[in-house]
């Protein structure tokens, strides 16, 4: 199961999925002219020159349940130039990953978010320096308080890296909060959890307890502290911006599929 989870995260990071790795030197040429969205039984499809898109390697036809996701995918296909650069297609990559993984991965994806939550970023605090301690407390205590009140649970944050078990009732309640989510939503939640390092922030965003900006800011307290003291190079700026696009894509999927 761990290998399968690593594989799905690799899809999200690298682009085109297990069946076709993106060549970073020679990108595939664009092979289509027209991009469309069409309703079908069970949802919507993206068409390239009238043909339904498939996952890399042509293994699976792609149908999504809502028009908003299909439209976002179509826009990514439309904006490709002479060559197809999958790194500029976060929605296509995310949906490909979900479809390639299959429904059998739903329990594993749910468990991945819960595993992060049990040893969450918000629960392990710095001892020093005091400035960082204060920044963590301001952002993370607020988040934990909101979560605790909403779900009727308690958390046991700690300082340092020594493992601090969380109450079983808390973990059980968090598990219940993910119990009805579908494959596409859970794929997006796994992506968000990996990008933020926090299952708790992800669950809070799922239940509309936090805005995307609040989650992103809380997830980067430590990084922003370091930037404030040491600065940030261009590569780091580019990398963070790319991750924010991936995060926003996952947020869009969750919002589009929300009842």
How should these model regions be labeled?
Residues 61, 128-135, 184, 188-192, ...:
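Conserved aromatic-histidine-acidic binding/catalytic patches
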């Amino acid at each position: 199961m761990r290998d399968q989870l690593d594989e799905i995260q690799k899809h999200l990071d690298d682009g085109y999925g297990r069946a076709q790795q993106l060549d970073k030197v020679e990108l595939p040429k664009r092979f289509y002219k027209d991009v469309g969205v069409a309703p079908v039984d069970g949802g919507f499809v993206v068409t390239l020159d009238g043909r339904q898109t498939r996952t890399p390697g042509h293994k699976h036809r792609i149908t999504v349940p809502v028009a908003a996701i299909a439209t976002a995918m179509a826009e990514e296909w439309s904006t490709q130039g002479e060559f197809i650069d999958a790194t500029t297609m976060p929605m296509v990559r995310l949906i490909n990953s979900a479809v390639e993984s299959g429904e059998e991965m739903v329990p594993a994806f749910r468990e991945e978010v819960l595993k992060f939550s049990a040893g969450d970023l918000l629960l392990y605090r710095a001892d020093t320096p005091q400035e960082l301690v204060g920044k963590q407390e301001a952002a993370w205590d607020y988040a934990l308080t909101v979560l605790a009140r909403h779900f009727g649970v308690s958390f046991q944050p700690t300082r340092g890296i020594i493992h601090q078990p969380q109450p079983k009732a808390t973990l059980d309640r968090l598990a219940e909060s993910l119990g009805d989510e579908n494959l596409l939503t859970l794929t997006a939640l796994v992506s968000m959890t990996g990008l933020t390092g926090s299952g708790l922030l992800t669950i809070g965003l799922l239940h509309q307890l936090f805005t995307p900006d609040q989650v992103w800011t809380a997830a980067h307290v430590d990084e922003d502290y370091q930037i404030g003291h040491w600065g940030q190079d261009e590569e780091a700026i580019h990398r963070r911006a790319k991750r924010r696009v991936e995060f926003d894509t996952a947020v869009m999927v969750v919002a589009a599929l929300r009842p």
